C-alpha cells in the first residue's frame, strides 16, 4: 500500500516546528485563518529539508522541555542561516536564545516563572504593529531568558519576565515568551498576522477556491485514466471527497457504500438518496453487516475494534474491486486532525484513527487522501465552495468505525439499537431547539453500565446512556456544550420512555483535553 496525499509543494506556506506543545496545532490553525497555509513539521527537520519545503516563514512552537537538560528537543543551527523569518514561541524563544549565544535559566532560579494571563508592555516592533503598547497575553513558562544573544534587542516585558519579547530585525528572527495562538492573548492573532503578512511577506491568498483548483489538477495527474474507489459513510468528510473527486475525474469514480451494521438510524437510505440521487455519484452498496458483526463478536478492546473494522472495510473493498477493471486507487476522507491525533514524534499515540491505523499492508490499492491537510471547518468551507447544501456540509461528524466506538465493551444488537434510537432523539431535539449549528458535535454513547431503576411498579436493571455534546472551532480542543437544562430534560425523558433497555441518562461535561471527543 502506498500513500498519495495532498501535494502542497508549490503553495506559499509557513511551517511550525513541533516541540511538543499542547498548543502547536493551534498555531498552524491561526496562520491558516490569516490566509496562509501552515503545517507542522518535526523539530528534527534539517536545514536542507527546510530549503526543499521552501517556506516563507518558520515558527518554533512551545514545549515541555528545558533547553539545558540532556535530550531536550533541538534544532539544526543552520536553519537560522537560511534567511527565512523565524518566530520562536515560549520554548521556541528559549531555544533560539540558547542556540544563538544568550542565556536561559531553569525554573525558579530567576524567580520569574509565569502561568496564566499577564500584561505585556512592548516597544515599537514590526511584530507588534497596530497593537496596544500594553496588552493581555497568556504566559506558561518556568524557565526564563536572562541574557539575549548579540545583535538582539528587547521589545517586550511583563511584571515577572524582563525578556517577554526579543528580536534581531536585521535577520528577521523574533522570540516571544507568551502564546499568541490562544484566545487568552487578546491581540495574539494580530501578532501572528504581522509575522505572516508583514514580516514573512506572505500574500495571504490561501483559500478553498485555490485548494479546489490545485486538488483537481493533482488528482487528474495522479489518477490518469484509472478508476478510484471511495468509501462513503454518509458523513461530511467522505461526502466532500466524493463530490471533489467526481468534479475531477467524473465516471472514473466508483463509490462503495459499506453497510457494516454500525450506522445511525436511517443512514443507509439517506446516503443512497442524497449522494446517489441528488449528486449522481455512482454508488455500489455492499451489505456486509453480518460479516462485520461476526468479526466483532466478543471483542471489547477499542483498539482491536478499530483494527478489525479497518481491515474488514478494506477487504470488502477488495471483494468489490475484484469485480471491476482498472481500479488502482482507494480514496479516504482523512483530515489533518486525524493524522495529528494518531501521534507524532513528540507525543504518544492517543488512539489510532480509523482513517490512519488498521489498514492492512497487503491491500491492493494506492491511497488518496485529498483532505489530509485540512481541518474540519475548512472541509465544511470546501463543501460549500463545491456547491453542496448546508444539510450535507453541516451534517454531524460520524467516525468510520460507526457505532462500534459508541458502544462500550462488547457489541451486541441490543446495545446498537439503544444508541441508534437515543441518538436519533438527541439530534431531533437539538434541531428543534435551534442548537444544531451552535453545537459542533453531539451524539449518544451506550456506556455498557447497567443500573437499577423503577418504571411503573417494577424494578429495572438497564443501560446508562451518556450524551456527549461539544463546542469547538477545529476539533483540536473542545469544551462541553452548555445545553439548556430544559432541553436536556426533554431529551432524557424521551430516551428513557421511548428506547427499550435504557433507564438512566448522564451528560458528559469533560473538555478536550483531557478527554477526546469520542469515548473510544
UniProtKB/Swiss-Prot annotation:
SUPFAM superfamilies in alphabetical order: Adenine nucleotide alpha hydrolases-like, Class I glutamine amidotransferase-like
Reaction(s) the record says it catalyses: XMP + L-glutamine + ATP + H2O = GMP + L-glutamate + AMP + diphosphate + 2 H(+)
Active-site residues from the entry: 90, 179, 181
Pathway: Purine metabolism; GMP biosynthesis; GMP from XMP (L-Gln route): step 1/1
Residues that, per the record, bind ATP: 233-239
Top-level lineage group: Bacteria
Keyword terms, alphabetized: ATP-binding, Glutamine amidotransferase, GMP biosynthesis, Ligase, Nucleotide-binding, Purine biosynthesis
Annotated EC: 6.3.5.2
Any GO MF annotation of the entry: GMP synthase activity
GO cellular component term, pick one: cytosol
Positions of the GMPS ATP-PPase domain: 206-395
Function, in words: Catalyzes the synthesis of GMP from XMP.
Name the UniProt record assigns to this protein: GMP synthase [glutamine-hydrolyzing]
Organism whose genome encodes this protein: Streptococcus pneumoniae (strain CGSP14)
Gene: guaA
Amino acid at each position: 500500500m502506498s500513500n498519495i496525499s495532498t501535494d502542497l509543494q508549490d503553495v506559499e506556506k509557513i511551517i511550525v516546528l513541533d516541540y511538543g506543545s499542547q498548543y502547536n496545532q493551534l498555531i498552524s490553525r491561526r496562520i491558516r485563518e490569516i490566509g496562509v497555509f501552515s503545517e507542522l513539521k518535526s523539530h528534527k527537520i534539517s536545514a536542507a529539508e527546510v530549503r526543499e519545503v521552501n517556506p516563507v516563514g518558520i515558527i518554533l512552537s512551545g514545549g515541555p522541555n528545558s533547553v539545558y537538560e540532556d535530550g531536550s528537543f533541538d534544532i539544526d543551527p543552520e536553519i537560522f542561516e537560511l534567511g527565512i523569518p523565524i518566530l520562536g514561541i515560549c520554548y521556541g524563544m528559549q531555544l533560539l536564545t540558547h542556540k544563538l549565544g544568550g542565556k536561559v535559566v531553569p525554573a525558579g532560579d530567576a524567580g520569574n516563572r509565569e502561568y496564566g494571563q499577564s500584561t505585556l508592555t512592548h516597544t515599537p516592533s514590526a511584530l507588534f504593529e497596530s497593537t496596544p503598547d500594553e496588552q493581555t497575553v497568556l504566559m506558561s513558562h518556568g524557565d526564563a531568558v536572562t541574557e539575549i544573544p548579540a545583535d538582539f534587542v528587547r521589545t517586550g516585558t511583563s511584571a515577572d519576565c524582563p525578556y517577554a519579547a526579543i528580536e534581531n530585525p536585521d535577520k528577521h528572527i523574533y522570540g516571544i515568551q507568551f502564546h499568541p495562538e490562544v484566545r487568552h492573548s487578546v491581540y495574539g492573532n494580530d501578532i501572528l498576522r504581522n509575522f505572516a503578512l508583514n514580516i514573512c511577506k506572505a500574500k495571504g491568498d490561501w483559500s478553498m477556491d485555490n485548494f479546489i483548483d490545485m486538488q483537481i489538477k493533482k488528482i487528474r495527474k495522479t489518477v490518469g485514466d484509472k478508476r478510484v474507489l471511495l468509501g462513503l459513510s454518509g458523513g461530511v468528510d467522505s461526502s466532500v471527497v466524493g463530490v471533489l473527486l467526481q468534479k475531477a475525474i467524473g465516471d472514473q469514480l466508483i463509490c462503495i457504500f459499506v453497510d457494516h451494521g454500525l450506522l445511525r438510524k436511517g443512514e443507509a437510505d439517506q446516503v443512497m438518496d442524497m449522494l446517489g440521487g441528488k449528486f449522481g455519484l455512482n454508488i455500489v452498496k455492499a451489505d456486509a453487516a453480518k460479516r462485520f458483526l461476526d468479526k466483532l463478536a466478543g471483542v471489547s478492546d477499542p483498539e482491536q475494534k478499530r483494527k478489525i473494522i479497518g481491515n474488514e472495510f478494506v477487504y470488502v473493498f477488495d471483494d468489490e474491486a475484484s469485480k471491476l477493471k482498472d481500479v488502482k486507487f482507494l480514496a479516504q476522507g482523512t483530515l489533518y486532525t486525524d493524522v495529528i491525533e494518531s501521534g507524532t514524534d513528540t507525543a504518544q499515540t492517543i488512539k489510532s484513527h480509523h482513517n490512519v491505523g488498521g489498514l492492512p499492508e497487503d491491500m491492493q490499492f494506492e491511497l488518496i487522501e485529498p483532505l489530509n491537510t485540512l481541518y474540519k471547518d475548512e472541509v465544511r468551507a470546501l463543501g460549500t465552495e463545491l456547491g453542496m447544501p448546508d444539510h450535507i456540509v453541516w451534517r454531524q461528524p460520524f467516525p468510520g468505525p460507526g457505532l462500534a466506538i459508541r458502544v462500550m465493551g462488547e457489541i451486541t444488537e441490543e446495545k446498537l439499537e439503544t444508541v441508534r434510537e437515543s441518538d436519533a432523539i438527541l439530534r431531533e431535539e437539538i434541531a428543534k431547539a435551534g442548537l444544531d449549528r451552535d453545537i459542533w458535535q453531539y451524539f449518544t454513547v451506550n456506556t455498557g453500565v447497567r443500573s437499577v431503576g423503577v418504571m411503573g411498579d417494577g424494578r429495572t436493571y438497564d443501560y446508562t446512556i451518556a450524551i456527549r455534546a461539544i463546542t469547538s472551532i477545529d476539533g483540536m480542543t473542545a469544551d462541553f456544550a452548555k445545553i439548556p437544562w430544559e432541553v436536556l430534560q426533554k431529551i432524557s425523558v424521551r430516551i428513557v420512555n421511548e428506547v427499550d433497555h435504557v433507564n438512566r441518562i448522564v451528560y458528559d461535561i469533560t473538555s478536550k483535553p483531557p478527554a477526546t471527543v469520542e469515548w473510544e
